[in-house]
Structures are given as C-alpha cells and as structure tokens.
C-alpha cells in the first residue's frame, strides 16, 4: 500500500515531511513494534473525538465545497442532536469539531449542544464561514474551550472571495468575523483553499491572515470531493503552479515562524494511508445521522437514527480502517486525482455502507 506511492506525485507538505513515504514506512514499523509488545493499542474502546456536521444548510455556495453544503436534504431533529451529544459525553470524547453546513444557522440551539459537551470537559474546533458571526455571538462562544475557531477566507480581495463563495459581500463579513474572534482573544485560524481564482494572490492572503490576528493559516489545494469534483474544470490548477505555491508557503512558513503558523492540508493519498496505519480514533456524524470514520472517505458505518453510537463504534467503528472495502479504496488512491475516477466519489456518489 505504501510502496505504490511516488513522492513526486504527492502534494508537498509545509512544514516538514520532506519524504512523506518514508514517514509512512517508519510510522507503520514503529506501531507494529509497539503493538507486538502490547504497549500501543490496536483498537480503542472509545473514539477520542467526533466531528458534528450539524446541518446541510449553508448561506454560501462555494464552488469547491467538499461536502456540497447548501443542499435541500433533511437534517435529523434537534432533539436527536441533543441525544447524540449526550451519547458522546457517555463515551468520554475529548474533542469535538463543530461544522456543517454553517453551524451558526442553528441559532440559540447551537449553544445548548455545546453546553452539554463543554460541561463534560470537551474542547472544540469551531468551523464557520463568518457571515453570521457578530459581537454578541462571539461573546457567547467565548465561554467554551477551543483548540481554535476557524474562519474560511478564500481571497485576499472581496471580488476573489465572493466569486468563489457565491455571495456578494461575503468577504467583508468573513474578514469582520475573523477580527472579532482575534480581538476577543480566541485562537483564530484562517482556512484558505487554493484554486485557480486565487492562486496568484496567495502571498497577499498570507499577509491578510497575519494582519487579521490569525495564530495559524491552514491552506492547500482543494480536495477532489463534492462540488470540487463537479467544478474541477473551472477551479483546477496544474502541478507546476501548485508546486510553486507550496514553495512560497515553505518560504513564508520560515519567515513567519513565531508570529503565525503556516501549514498545508495533507495530500489525500498520504493521509488515507496514515489513517489505515493508526487505530481508528474519531467519528463523523452527518446532518442526516449517517456515521462515518472520515470526512473524505466515501463510506458510512451506520446511522444514529437506527443504532446507538457506542454500538456502531464497537461493531465496526473501532476497526473500520482495517475493513477490506476501505483498504481497497485507499489502495486505489495513489495520487489526489484518483479521487475523481475511483468509485464511489466522496460526496458525489452515495456513500457505501460497510458492516
């Protein structure tokens, strides 16, 4: 599975990981040694964390959206989400990613869910497009403990961001949201997806993120998933351009060291193999209740409407990455573009249920 990769076909990593394939080999060997001595688990009794995609609804229509947020599919009831959070507390998770869609569309109900988790010591990553974030909401969000609050900004200029995100005026609101988060003393992360319309302005975006007070900028080429697959002809950039962009990111990473972290998203072929190597440790729950083990893996392992989360985890979740169907899919992704042709395609085709 590792030997079929070619380093030159992987997206570069910033910072470090100059040889990603060697890292996979070393990690795999080390885990095998530790597990053979029973000093590192092969399976976990409970997941360490969970991502909650609280709604399909979104107030933007981003042309690269990995899960096609903004569709008209039904969400599970709020009462069910309350039940889900209580189940996760019973499973003693440590961290929770709050996302969507746009989670702030839940209005006051959002805080009820976060209260349940927070009261049990859960720490959050909060992902928002920033359109609905104002001083009042930032104040309410300030009561929780965060790894970071992530605001997505896909352009250093209004016309770039608004074109990518499909709504005029969205850049101004996103930038204001980032300022409010930073000024409140909360850990701000700017997420920036590189594509055809913004790649020439990457250096500007780095400076913009720093000026907004971000502690980190997470960036990288879009993932071939969801709307990015459907719109790939209009947003794709070639290997030469993307590699030059990553060279710039490496330079700026060194220049901004100690002031702002600049990190890149991980190449899917590398990332999926890394997940196969390590024990399953997280879950993702979709707005319709489907339970998955990863956001770009086109498989589901159950639904919270039909089964308790602990039962799903014990039945298949904790060993899901060792499932033959998943392993064969991972083997088929030798470079990022294989996600276009390999079936099922994430968030384009129906997820396959594994048992």
What residue ranges belong to the model's regions?
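Flexible mid-to-C-terminal extensions adjoining Fe-S/redox cofactors in radical SAM and related proteins
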Residues: 2-15, 23-34, 294-355
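Alpha-helix boundary/capping residues
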Residues: 69, 88, 168, 209, ...
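Radical SAM enzyme [4Fe-4S]-AdoMet core and its adjacent flexible, acidic
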Residues: 1-4, 10-11, 154, 159-279, ...
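Radical SAM/AdoMet-radical enzyme domain recognition
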Residues: 78-98, 106-221
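Alpha-helix boundary recognition
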Residues: 89, 118, 142, 210, ...
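Conserved alpha-helical substructure of the radical SAM core
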Residues: 2-148
């Amino acid at each position: 599975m590792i030997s079929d990769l070619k380093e030159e076909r992987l997206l570069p990593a910033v910072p470090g990981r100059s040889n990603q394939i060697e890292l996979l080999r070393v990690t795999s060997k080390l885990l095998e040694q530790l597990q053979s001595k029973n000093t590192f688990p092969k399976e976990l009794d409970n997941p360490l964390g969970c991502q909650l995609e609280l709604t399909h609804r979104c107030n933007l229509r981003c042309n690269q959206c990995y899960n096609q947020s903004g569709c008209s599919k039904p969400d599970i009831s709020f009462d069910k989400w309350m039940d889900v959070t209580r189940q996760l507390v019973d499973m003693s998770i440590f961290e929770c990613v709050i996302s969507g869609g746009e989670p702030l569309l839940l209005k006051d109900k959002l805080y009820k869910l976060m209260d349940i988790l927070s009261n049990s010591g859960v720490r959050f990553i909060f992902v928002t497009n920033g359109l609905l974030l104002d001083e009042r909401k930032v104040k309410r969000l300030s009561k929780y403990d965060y790894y970071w609050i992530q605001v997505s900004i896909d352009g250093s200029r209004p016309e770039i961001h608004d074109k990518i995100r499909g709504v005029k005026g969205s850049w101004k609101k996103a930038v204001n949201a980032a300022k409010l988060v930073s000024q409140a003393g909360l850990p701000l992360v700017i997420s920036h997806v590189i594509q055809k319309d913004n790649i020439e302005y990457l250096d500007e975006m780095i400076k913009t993120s720093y000026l907004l007070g971000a502690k980190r900028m997470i960036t990288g080429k879009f993932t071939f998933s969801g709307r990015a697959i459907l719109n790939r002809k209009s947003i794709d950039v070639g290997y030469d351009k993307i590699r030059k962009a990553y060279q710039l990111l490496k330079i700026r990473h060194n220049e901004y060291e100690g002031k702002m972290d600049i990190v890149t998203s991980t190449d899917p072929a590398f990332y999926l193999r890394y997940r196969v190597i390590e024990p399953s440790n997280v879950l993702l729950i979709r707005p319709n209740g489907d339970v998955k083990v990863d956001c770009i893996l086109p498989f589901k392992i159950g639904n919270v409407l039909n089964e308790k989360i602990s039962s799903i985890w014990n039945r298949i979740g904790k060993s899901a990455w060792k499932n033959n169907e998943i392993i064969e899919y991972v083997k088929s992704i030798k470079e990022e573009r294989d996600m276009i042709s390999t079936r099922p395609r994430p968030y384009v085709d129906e997820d396959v249920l594994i048992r």
